[in-house]
Every structure is written in structure tokens, then in C-alpha cells.
Amino acid sequence: MEENPDLLEAYAKLNIARLERREAKDALEWLADEYRHLWPLAPEKLLGAANADKGTRSGDAECDIIGRFMLRDTSVLTKRLAAKFRQLNPTACFVVMSPEDAQERLERAKTYVPKGRTEKALAAKRALKERYIAESEHQLVLAREYRAETTRLRIAAGVDQAKRRVSDAETAVSDACRDISQAAAFTPEGLRIKAEAIKASGIFEAFKGSGGIMAEISSFVQSVINVAPKLANAA
């Protein structure tokens, strides 16, 4: 019995899409390597909380040109981090203050109303306000400069286009996997193709090494991929 031509056509599309996805991802990685020496570290005065890659503010974390979290050497951040934290965390990813955050901080500093029971206390609070305003203005300048430079480099490198290429390739893989799942299989080779498409979709990646029904299904799919060629040869 011959295999379903629709299934074979969809499988050919999957192989083309997977090749394009791999090449697109390689091209994106190449950009990261090519621009690593040009990509600036955020000024230390803009750094916020540590472990930004693990918390709820990962969207504000310091990243490289393609959006991967950047880990800094904490041993040099003696004024910012306690010795114990530096010992336990040799590297860490930090939140970076955006121009919007810096502008908001500046507005808070400007609207702060100094209060004090004595003239001396009031004078101290006024001086504190002026210092906060000056620091916030400096942070705003730094944040705008950092945003401008990183944006310039992303545009020069064509990062958005490279990411769009990866996204388009992922969509093509998903479309091919869907077409394969909807086509009937007539032979053991067809079963292998369908199982391979399920694996290629990435749906089971999160369940590797875990228990439960999804892990069992993932194991079954891999078994089909392994056994189907033997069945085809035996036939």
C-alpha cells in the first residue's frame, strides 16, 4: 500500500519549514555574537532589583540585543549588593530603569513637600529634595541615552526582521504539523511521520522528565518514531 500523497506533501513542507527555522535561529544567534562587543551595559545608576530574570519584572530586565537575559558579575557591585548576596550569587540579572520610570521618579521628587519640626530639620529635608531631583534628572538623561543607543543598534542589526523570520518559520512548522495531523496515514511510515510532527510541534518539550499522562503520551510518540521504521522494513 502506498502512503497518502497529502501526508507526504505535508511532511515535505514540514522538513522545509524546520530547515528554515533552524537557519533563522542560527542567524539570530549570529546577530547576538556579532554585536556582543558593541552592546552597552546599562549604566549602574539605572540598575534596580536583582534576579530580574526570575521575578515578575522580567520585562524590565537587562537583555542583550536579541532579548536574552544578561547576567552581570556581582563581585564588582560592592556598593549595591551585600557581601553575602554576592557570595551566593556570583552573577545576577538586574531590572533596568526605563525613561518612563525615570520620568515618574523625577515627578515624585519634584512634588515631594519637605516637612520638619525645626528649621534645621526642614532645611535638611529641602536639601534631600534637591538631591533627589538632581539624581532623578541624571537618571532620566542616562535612561534616554541608553534607550537611544540600544534602539539604534537593534535597528542597525535588523533584529526585528530576524525575529520576524524566526516567528514566520515557527508558524510554517505549526501549519505543516497541523496539515500532517489532519491527513490520514496508510502505512507504518505514515504513522512515523505523524508522530514526528507531534514531536516537532514542541508540545511535549515541557513534559520531558516529568510524570503524568502527558509524559506517557510523549514516550508513546517517541516509541512510534523508533518502531515504525522497523515495521516498515519488516513489511
Describe the role of every protein-language-model region.
Residues 1, 162-235:
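C-terminal or late-domain output modules
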Residues 4-15, 90-100, 106-149, 153:
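Charged, low-complexity eukaryotic segments
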Residues 20, 34, 38-41, 72, ...:
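Surface-exposed polar/charged interaction patches
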